[in-house]
Amino acid sequence: MSKSKFTTEVEHLNKITEFTESSWNSIKPEYAARMRLQNQFKSGIDIAKYTSSLMRKDMDAYDADSSSYTQSLGCWHGFIAQQKLISIKKHFGTTDKKYLYLSGWMIAALRSEFGPLPDQSMHEKTSVAALIKELYTFLRQADARELGGLFRELDAASDSDKPTIQEKIDSFETHIVPIIADIDAGFGNEEATYLMAKQMIEAGACCIQIENQVSDEKQCGHQDGKVTVPHADFLAKINAVRYAFLELGVDDLSLIHISEPTRLRRI
């Protein structure tokens, strides 16, 4: 987040004609610009586009050097995600290469209104998208909180201390990180998979994990007895997810296929 962006926001707001009217005297363009910086992601699509570019960069870095890996932390509630990322940023000084991972088994066990369930796609199909939205709501709140504190420090600082605080504002790193979201086996045919993927992307997901099992017979990927779909059917679901990403303008999409127990593969 750069100073020039803040200045640009102030200049843009100053061009709003209402600021010249007496009824707007109490509204300060600088404060409105601060609020815009505290809420730089206006929608889940904005988040998906931002995080997808991060993930693509990280995958390219890993392909070039396997020691440049990422870490994905399981998370089942927005507050947990918020505290994780605040702690990570405080400990490491950055959120770089730190992701959140929404596994289907975790959603089934901890987020279903039916109560704890096994990893068999029996939970509500919209629960993953709902959790994605919740996580990013809390992470955006973390941004607003930290920047709000810096703005208050800036207002109270002496002239000699202001440049240091301004530099912290200019170099602020968001708590928004990529989410890998599990769509199980798509919760139906390719059209159902497309609709579900679209909802997840609209909530902010930049990466979707999908399995080639029959949706109604879905089991945990670590268990035996899985019933898989024909190759053509699975490709149709993969393409359905790709179309969902492309329709929403998220071009740096990422898809992961569970090809065997404990192994993830990019597709």
Which stretches of residues belong to each language-model region?
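N-terminal capping/small domains of soluble enzymes
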Residues: 2-159, 165-175
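Conserved catalytic or regulatory cores that recognize and/or transform ribose-phosphate-containing ligands
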Residues: 12, 20, 24-28, 32-33, ...
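A cross-family glycoside hydrolase active-site/sugar-binding cleft signature
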Residues: 72-76, 103, 180-184, 209-211, ...
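Active-site-proximal loop/turn and secondary-structure-junction residues that shape catalytic pockets
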Residues: 74-80, 106, 185-187, 214-216, ...
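Short amphipathic alpha-helices and their capping/turn segments at secondary-structure boundaries
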Residues: 81-95, 193-202, 237-249
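Active-site beta->alpha loop and helix N-cap motifs at the rims of alpha/beta catalytic domains
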Residues: 116-235, 247
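Metal-dependent phosphodiesterase/phospholipase catalytic core, i.e.
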Residues: 230-238, 252-255
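Single conserved hydrophobic/aromatic residue that forms the stacking wall/gate
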Residues: 256-267
